[in-house]
Amino acid sequence: MFLAVKIPIRRFHVSYKVFESSKKSAKEVIELINSSSLSNKETFDSSSNVPEWKRQKLALKSKFKGEKWNPKKKLSRVEMDTVRLLKDKIPSLTASDLGDKFKVSPEAIRRILKSKWQPSAEEISKIEDRWKKRGIRVEEIMKKRKIWNSHIGPNGVTNTLVIGSGNNSPIHTIKKMVSNNSDDKTNTSKMDLARKKSKLELLKKTLNQ
């Protein structure tokens, strides 16, 4: 007698996206992987206990739609004044030439040249105050660098020991017991003179004999 046994057969549905990706470029494959990743599906609620760094990361991702953050360069007031001055002195310079020089778009150069805005006396005083404060900060940084360089020995090795990572952490100087060079020179010269005298005495003795 033969028994009829039914064996269940499972059929798997395989997506052809992976096979199609072999025909695509590397950039398209990376975009496909990023679009299917779990990080793209992440959402957060303002009331949930999400860390601040994660909240900021997700907010930037939703704002820039997954693109890399690449802010446009903005020229300072001094650079804007130099753009206007160059255009006045050399009218043959085009917006594209100035844009290549200052690494901005020609449209930004056109807007700077078209603008008629001039700072008031109060704004000029505020700008000068900011520059003064900036100069004070630069002087403080240079002083700190000089102090740090004074702690470095001739061989490039620091002779200071900082305990702790705070700004008010104590600094201990490492003192080296180095013999004075002048004392060493005097000692060696005395020894040389004694040797010379002993040699002369030996010569005198040999001659007298």
Swiss-Prot record:
GO terms for cellular component: mitochondrion; nucleus. It comes from the Eukaryota. Keywords: Mitochondrion, Transit peptide. Disulfide bonds: none annotated. Residues 1-19 form a transit peptide. It is found in: Mitochondrion. Its main location: mitochondrion. It holds the Pfam family Neugrin. Belongs to the RRG9 family. Required for respiratory activity and maintenance and expression of the mitochondrial genome. This is Required for respiratory growth protein 9, mitochondrial. It comes from Vanderwaltozyma polyspora (strain ATCC 22028 / DSM 70294 / BCRC 21397 / CBS 2163 / NBRC 10782 / NRRL Y-8283 / UCD 57-17) (Kluyveromyces polysporus). The gene is RRG9.
